[in-house]
């Protein structure tokens, strides 16, 4: 776990960029329409740590030693796209809270929340048009949006089919979480005129960061001691089987596997959650997931070190480590 001092040091190289981003993000979430103003204000106060905009800025600095006006704009676009996707996810999942705050669909209704998500998405499009981003940057944003939709549809389909394969799990992760991390890294590189080879390396780096982030997020669902803005076992209740339990399913004896599947194929009650959390710990699912995070972390660090040495590279290395060690 990183100390508070190390976390503070990580903030220093990006402080000015993030301050500018936060001001731009706040301005973008404003409307004269009364029906929207309260909802947009709520989004401002319930936004997260802005991890994806940080990646945009760091990858720009990694490739060119500086950021540009397009870098800031790209960071705003990616965060607006991320925000819109979360609003729609909450509707799909019937979620009442996110990060400990009520969701828009809880405050209003599913119908209104969908339209509010569309408004935020349209705001991202307006930012793209107004800044005249390059065709390649437009393509990256559009592809990220498509991958988000594909990933969500895949997850819903797999949940209904009760399919439990690790390769399917990673396919969903790379399209949902990984899509925006990959796009963030690519946009950062493209915003400063990086070479095609640099853009590709940044994209792969972003994908690996997305995987590490999601696996760590999955572990939170199995830890009753963590306070991450959602109850323990929340994903299981929604029919989402993540890596800790997938590992157990794919290594269990036939009778035990059938028993686990029987729990997953019926409405999940408190006793069922306790059983599934316990079996994931006792059968090595938690340990396996932690090892996978370590492998992904090392691959990301090795890739990062293919870039020229710089203070930004050192910052990104600490940032990647923090993603795999964060507490929420």
Where are these regions (language model features)?
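All-alpha prenyltransferase/terpene-synthase fold signal
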Residues: 1-328
